[in-house]
Curated annotation (Swiss-Prot):
Summary of the function given for this chain in its UniProt record: Catalyzes the ferrous insertion into protoporphyrin IX and participates in the terminal step in the heme biosynthetic pathway.
Gene: FECH
Family to which this protein belongs: Belongs to the ferrochelatase family.
Transcription regulation in keyword set: no
Pathway assignment: Porphyrin-containing compound metabolism; protoheme biosynthesis; protoheme from protoporphyrin-IX: step 1/1
The organism's place on the tree of life at top rank: Eukaryota
Regulation of this protein's activity per its record: Inhibited by nitric oxide (NO). The 2Fe-2S cluster could act as a NO sensor.
Lineage start: Eukaryota, Metazoa, Chordata, Craniata, Vertebrata
Organism annotation: Homo sapiens (Human)
Outcome of mutating F417L: Decreased activity
Name of this protein: Ferrochelatase, mitochondrial
């Protein structure tokens, strides 16, 4: 039972659902790069971010012509309203790509029902729901507008959102794409760094859809399954880091320690050969190269739960350790997240940058703004799709290689599905 509890907690963390009760915050629509100075809280809310988010409402895409190319933007998603929380948890606990539980079909509904009230309260206190759909819609709108200019031969382009655990579900998005009569479909993960528990699960859902309905796709599928070192992605991260460094006192700026924080993984997953740690490290290395190694830095890992070994060092322990060693000016950079959600808005902004920082005696701590509505990020997405179309490749070479100790037979079927497509 101890192992079972650890698996359940790990699953919640992997889906970005915090088990702890968050403090009240203003809203998830506002990125809050908090700074503590001499133990006193000085909340610095980025006005530009707030303006972006206020205008980032999902809109129906105007279609003057029948879409020719569809881009399916894949993500786990998050409950958009409090009423979505139960179904979100239920689908999460039923996902065998994420975890395997005994009598899962019976245990999952029990766990979801038991957890729903507490999770609803958490989302209520950060604005009533997750911002992932809002930001994905805004990013998709910018992406397809640019794509129509970059690649007129494959236009019109239309983006579709495919979430694993909330509407619009991946399966619902595929059905809409089939109804639209697309010629080309691109499964585009919104996780820059590949993991079997995130991108892998979303790609498996596409394979399972066609396997269950018993028919072949009417459109030609390919996938952008990872993009950890894309030059515009790296530029976005570098720009946001430089922007936050400017807020530190001039005399302290060169001493600021940059902590790149990514969601951790259990070592049992890593030791099967999941490429996630290497790809996150590659992103960090490229960002620091772009910054010409302007400051000392470390890659740290957040959201560990349970007694089992996870990737380390942990973000909170790293903050404590740095303070104990006299390094009290810290910049947190969420390097594996492209938009704000509960792990940035609560875990980084409140738990670490307010509560923990005050306890440790941090002088200055800030968090780099997430990519959210940055126009350069939409340009990055468009460039990735455009380059993918021009390459005429079905997927990356890495996707053709299974983890050396993979235990999920569906992964092999999914790889076969994508590599057997004809463009």
């Amino acid at each position: 039972m101890r192992s079972l509890g650890a698996n359940m907690a790990a699953a919640l963390r992997a889906a970005g659902v915090l088990l702890r009760d968050p403090l009240a915050s203003s809203s998830w629509r506002v990125c809050q790069p908090w700074r503590w100075k001499s133990g006193a809280a000085a909340a610095a809310v980025t006005t530009e971010t707030a303006q972006h988010a206020q205008g980032a409402k999902p809109q129906v895409q105007p279609q003057k012509r029948k879409p020719k190319t569809g881009i399916l933007m894949l993500n786990m998603g998050g409950p958009e309203t409090l009423g979505d929380v139960h179904d979100f948890l239920l689908r999460l606990f039923l996902d065998r790509d994420l975890m395997t539980l005994p009598i899962q079909n019976k245990l999952a509904p029990f766990i979801a029902k038991r957890r729903t009230p507490k999770i609803q309260e958490q989302y209520r206190r950060i604005g009533g729901g997750s911002p992932i759909k809002i930001w994905t819609s805004k990013q998709g709108e910018g992406m397809v507008k640019l794509l129509d200019e970059l690649s007129p031969n494959t236009a019109p382009h239309k983006y579709y959102i495919g979430f694993r655990y909330v509407h619009p579900l991946t399966e619902e998005a595929i059905e809409e794409m089939e109804r639209d009569g697309l010629e080309r479909a691109i499964a585009f993960t919104q996780y820059p760094q590949y993991s079997c528990s995130t991108t892998g699960s979303s790609l498996n859902a596409i394979y399972r859809y066609y396997n269950q309905v018993g028919r072949k796709p009417t459109m030609k599928w390919s996938t952008i399954d990872r993009w950890p070192t894309h030059h515009l992605l790296i530029q976005c991260f570098a720009d946001h880091i430089l922007k936050e460094l400017d807020h530190f006192p001039l005399e302290k700026r060169s001493e600021v320690v940059i902590l790149f924080s990514a969601h951790s993984l259990p070592m049992s997953v890593v030791n099967r050969g999941d490429p996630y740690p290497q790809e996150v490290s590659a992103t960090v290395q490229k960002v620091m190269e772009r910054l010409e190694y302007c400051n000392p830095y470390r890659l740290v890992w957040q959201s560990k739960v349970g007694p089992m070994p996870w990737l380390g060092p942990q973000t909170d322990e790293s903050i404590k350790g740095l303070c104990e060693r006299g390094r009290k000016n810290i910049l947190l950079v969420p390097i594996a997240f492209t938009s704000d959600h509960i792990e940035t808005l609560y875990e980084l902004d409140i738990e670490y940058s307010q509560v923990l920082a005050k306890e440790c005696g941090v002088e200055n701590i800030r968090r780099a703004e997430s990519l959210n509505g940055n126009p350069l990020f939409s340009k990055a997405l468009a460039d990735l799709v455009h380059s993918h179309i021009q390459s005429n490749e079905l997927c990356s070479k890495q996707l053709t290689l299974s983890c050396p100790l993979c235990v999920n037979p569906v992964c092999r079927e999914t790889k076969s599905f994508f590599t057997s497509q004809q463009l």
